Amino acid sequence: MSILYVSPHPDAFPSLRALIAARYGEAGDGPGWGGPHPRICLQPPPSSRTPFPPPRLPALEQGPGGLWVWGAPAVAQLLWPAGLGGPGGSRAAVLVQQWVSYADTELIPAACGATLPALGLRGPGQDPQAALGALGKALNPLEDWLRLHTYLAGDAPTLADLAAVTALLLPFRYVLDPSARRIWGNVTRWFNTCVRQPEFRAVLGEVALYSGARSVTQQPGSEVIAPQKTPAQLKKEAKKREKLEKFQQKQKTQQQPPHGEKKPKPEKKEKRDPGVITYDLPTPPGEKKDVSGAMPDSYSPQYVEAAWYPWWERQGFFKPEYGRPSVSAPNPRGVFMMCIPPPNVTGSLHLGHALTNAIQDSLTRWHRMRGETTLWNPGCDHAGIATQVVVEKKLWKERGLNRHQLGREAFLEEVWKWKAEKGDRIYHQLKKLGSSLDWDRACFTMDPKLSATVTEAFVRLHEEGVIYRSTRLVNWSCTLNSAISDIEVDKKELTGRTLLPVPGYKEKVEFGVLVSFAYKVQGSDSDEEVVVATTRIETMLGDVAVAVHPKDPRYQHLKGKCVVHPFLSRSLPIVFDDFVDMEFGTGAVKITPAHDQNDYEVGQRHRLEAISIMDSKGALINVPPPFLGLPRFEARKAVLAALKERGLFRGVKDNPMVVPLCNRSKDVVEPLLRPQWYVRCGEMAQAASAAVTRGDLRILPEAHQRTWHSWMDNIRDWCISRQLWWGHRIPAYFITVHDPAVPPGEDPDGRYWVSGRTEAEAREKAAREFGVSPDKISLQQDEDVLDTWFSSGLFPFSIFGWPNQSEDLSVFYPGTLLETGHDILFFWVARMVMLGLKLTGKLPFREVYLHAIVRDAHGRKMSKSLGNVIDPLDVIHGVSLQGLYDQLLNSNLDPSEVEKAKEGQKADFPAGIPECGTDALRFGLCAYTSQGRDINLDVNRILGYRHFCNKLWNATKFALRGLGKGFVPSATSKPEGHESLVDRWIRSRLTEAVRLSNEGFQAYDFPAITTAQYSFWLYELCDVYLECLKPVLNGVDQVAAECARQTLYTCLDVGLRLLSPFMPFVTEELFQRLPRRTPKAPASLCVTPYPEPSECSWKDPEAEAALELALSITRAVRSLRADYNLTRTRPDCFLEVADEATGALASAVSGYVQALASAGVVAVLALGAPAPQGCAVAVASDRCSIHLQLQGLVDPARELGKLQAKRSEAQRQAQRLQERRAASSYSAKVPLEVQEADEAKLQQTEAELRKVDEAIALFQKML
């Protein structure tokens, strides 16, 4: 047995780090070291078993006499699951190692230095403000990195996040108040996201962030660190402060200029915020936007997004017919067809829909730009149960009416009116998202064309016997008075006794308990009894048997016997069945076939009667008084009291359980026996599974194929009837034959049900079935409607009018791709495949790509009651916190839920949601998408992509100035032949971006595409190429300048085309301002060819190697300039190289270094030649070092004075740390985490001393 020894102290962050790693090891594939999960011990190991020296906590003993590992980094590394942050060569693994090292060497010392004074553990001479400044400095790199990253290395927590979060636990608990957390908003968001992960929460609980008020008890051992000061010491410190204040006042006086001397220029005032920039030129809807004027100073989403969409729509760019005589015209590029997952017409789209549409539209635009005949078909789903519930709530809220008071026809009129209003809003949202849908083909699942398909499908399947009528157990909502599907059932996990609100009950109802009671054995002289237990005691009134295991020795003597029901005049047989678990409870279970799925199956095997004891509203039936007519949960209390009164109650205890809740009504779902319509799924499921096995249907990510086969292999028949009014009314009729020779039928008897496309057709079929004339047949159509998923399952071909043949059906069915969230793989995707194969003989699509589910920044599921359901338009336009509140008040939430949602909104969006724009939202959502993982969406990251849009804007604006008004681009993008090294380099990098983008689209790897494009524009084009271009465009070499302009134009042209699928608005706006290569160029960017590797084949390894050297030198120079505060000077730089080849390369890129590093002269030293005196040195690569000239730019004497003071302070700090650690009581009294922090601080201080000594030596040579 492995043992993990940890400190019990709640702030012992090294031990917490190990415990959380152990939790991840349990949740994953086991600890990375391959051993078993360790046992936790909250104390130091026995001295007899510890190695020498004694290990620090946490410590891991890998089995008796086995290897000892101690210290948080090593222990966490071993306990963390393999492959989730361990060593490796991948970029993610390198990032993990980088951030773990940063946490251990930078964050922990800074965090302890800032926190310990706050806890009363300040050492002599320690400055709390300086410590806080050091913490801020350590947090800055994290803040920058997390601006565009959810986690430190990848899309899920790794060892890096674990190390950094635990390092910052103390500051977040005791130091960083709300104002500080606003400064480091990205760090705070990331910290909260991590600590709310289940593995963190299991160890840390709820982490309370510092509010500004502190109450801390001084820890044992603090007297070693901060002994109480004597009055003499306090007096001495006061004198020091007084002297310091006088000195500072004197310095301030000396800095003021003498009378008559010119005063320094006042600082420039910040530019006035121009406010919101809007497009105000009169442009009729559908007309092209006027871009002939000057570009605004900065990017504005409102300005950029104006007018483009109506023009795109009027021009027909989104139609598959665009640019060709008809959709059936042969196209060597092929056909791309995808139908939208029709959003429910239940209100507004949320960010989950926005993700779906961002991905789908990006794919659609990419295929369209590749020249394929492209159709993305829009539509809207009637969402039967969801829509009916919302409209019923609205009617009750506004008019105090329910649907039964209104009547079926009048109620349906209300739903249609509501649909017209909400359907338009959903389409408006889709257009604001830039979705390039063909709106002329928009469909609604209740449209006549689609309704005809639904009727045809039902009738065909019923005639073949695939659809049948049967009485079975269904999920029943007593509030909705309807059966509901599995996807409409939420499973609430309870750990024990819990009181839950249930609609229709004034008091909360008890769940999470197991009640035991006794059944007396019939005819037993010894008063023998069998004890059973249940979580639903009221259902014992429907018990028909008691079951035990056939091999249970305790009950063998009861074979053939019965027990007596205490409230009913019936005996219950004791049956023997393998499903019973002998080890659970008494090994005996009650059997209630009409109210439990397992019991129903036992009843079928033993031919037991199923007695329903609840009606559709949840009131008890078929039971004696006093239980008859009681609501089910009132009956629960009555049955319990009656059992106690008869002496049959045997106890109650907490019981972990799952309570099924209707996600529409929040009612507790009951399994009830009801006659319903079912679809036989066995054969269709086999065909769907085989299609994936053969490779005819491809499901991506491939991990979902396992789920697919599992579902198909274990599928049950599908209940498709719903007791609602809104939806497709089932085209089935109950038959009454007015002929004495034909006995009357009963509901479950399928022979007395007939289906038909019309009532007349159904009457003819019924007459033929019973051999009578049609006039002797009376028909009553089923009141129920079809499950929404039935009509949705027909959507890929119902939108084209199946079964009628049409041009669209022949061209676009089967479709190319189905893209949707992985949560509806079974409920929608599987049913489309099964029904498509059954009814058309074809798969509805060739590929299925399943994206992740959007959660909030803390990993929580989107829920209106949590206040984290975000309208994408609120991210696009921005919204105040009050605006978010107002939306809640206009919703159908209960008042209690509104208050809870307000709290969630205030916590997540205290300042509201900033305006981000459509392009930033789309790009951010696609950048988030990682195959197979859910998305914890943080709106602040979306704001970061708005800044990226501003970068595009400014870069293009600069480029247009550089190109000049008379610039004429070459007819092709082919190089001129006189390109400079940096021209060749940027073309090479552009080639790589084109390759990665196309490969990413083909593989549905959206993060790879967005990363490639973001990096090209920001880090290569803007940060490097444009900077290197400035001296060329301002120089005298006209050939070089013209080559540069042509290359720059190519970068803009290709770069905007690359980005267009993700950012259609800003790229169109900028593209329209560029000159065209030919007069016949397409009118819009959205129908311009997408860049392909064959067009952009300028890979140049030689140029890339040269610029990589230039960038390495630049980074080193910038680092030295920052170290010596040379922000306003251009120091000379001398390059020391290891060989002539490196020297030649360095000479070739020296001009680029000069531009990028803001250096003066950049010269390459001859081999072996010494560098000039007074240079600071840094290493750029293994073949090149740089010498930055400081002579004349800094005052050596002044710098030496500052360095000597810094050295003295560092020495004093090191001495204090050494003395503290040498104290006799240190190891016994000081907490272990403080000891580790002291050791890290000492190492950091010694490293600083070495750097200071090097700098002192340099400046002494300059004197």
From Swiss-Prot:
It is an enzyme of class 6 (ligase). The modification Phosphoserine is found at S436, S526. CDD domains: Anticodon_Ia_Val (cd07962), UDM1_RNF168_RNF169-like (cd22249), ValRS_core (cd00817). Disulfide bonds: none annotated. A motif ('KMSKS' region) lies at residues 861-865. The modification N-acetylserine is found at S2. PROSITE patterns: AA_TRNA_LIGASE_I (PS00178), GST_CTER (PS50405). ATP binds at K864. GO terms for biological process: valyl-tRNA aminoacylation. Residues 218-294 are annotated as: Disordered. Residues 89-219 form the GST C-terminal domain. Forms high-molecular-mass aggregates with elongation factor 1. Belongs to the class-I aminoacyl-tRNA synthetase family. This is Valine--tRNA ligase.
